[in-house]
Amino acid sequence: MDAPIFTGNAAEGTTDLFETDYYGQPAYLTQSGQLYGEAMAMAMGKIYTFGPTFRAEKSKTRRHLSEFWMIEPEMAFCDIFENMDTIEAFLRAVVLEVIEKCPEELEVLGRDISKLQTISKTFPRLSYDEAVEILKGHKDVDGQNSIKVLEQDLLTVEMRITEVKADISSREAAITAGGMKKGEINFNQNKIDSQKQELKQLEEDQRNIPNWLKSARDFVYGNDFGGSDETVLTRLFDNPIMVYDWPHEIKAFYMKRNPEDPRFARGVDVLAPEGYGEIVGGGERETSEEWLVEKIKEHKLPMDVFQWYLDLRRYGSVPHAGFGLGLERLVAWVCKLDHVRETIPFPRYYGRLEP
């Protein structure tokens, strides 16, 4: 289905909305087609939307765009665990098809296909509590400790920086000294250029790892994961991981509470490996009108614009769930791109409106 791009209400929160005038009324560029997808799923059973979404986030990270495309399935008679099964099957099918049909393109991009072939393995599923324990180094994963791994990675990076700098200096000195044939000069210069690119990445890691360590050690239970936290977690896995059952305060108002422990919302985030972080967000939707009204008030959202959404519960609802997959983030991970803006011809992100 096609969800509207103009909307009178927020889907994810009011702090990152692009507001515009709609014939004298305030309107917003859509953050998600999900709420409309829920309405259609009640009639059709299983639906999906695919369209542009907009977030006014003043972020300059390599993961953020202000305008991007999302695929958003919504399924009636579906709970969080069936939703996670669907997400896993969907991602696996997409990645395996790319590997099968685009091997030459991946080779041109320098993508190590073996890093993608692990998609055939079952995705690890962690509760928020488990993920926090792993992040802070209180729980190991297959004998690996997040803090110790980072500390060792930092030592390895520093040693490699020393080696690369020494080799670059040696090759540059040999070229300057003369006596080399043209082919030898070209070979060494190409090697130097390659090593300088490697050195750039190594020095970035040298700057980042101490920050990741501090963020992991200082992480406060109950907070959402930031980019550095997602990076630390995913360094211990070679496949996307699913983190579910989040503190309800940090999830959207429409997330269903865990009936066995109402402190948690039945949301799930899928974090891609190799530092790419969240590529899918989803969960089971709240079917209780009473809970929804409470959450709308808690999030300080205008009740009047959500009456149509509350009507979906007043006049009969069923368990349902869904997710949103950010297309550009998925492409960035599959192709191992440095920045999500490389995935789209004319990117829109904080500070860029042209061309």
Task: State each model region's role.
Residues 74-78, 92, 273:
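Solvent-exposed residues in well-ordered beta-strands and their adjoining turns
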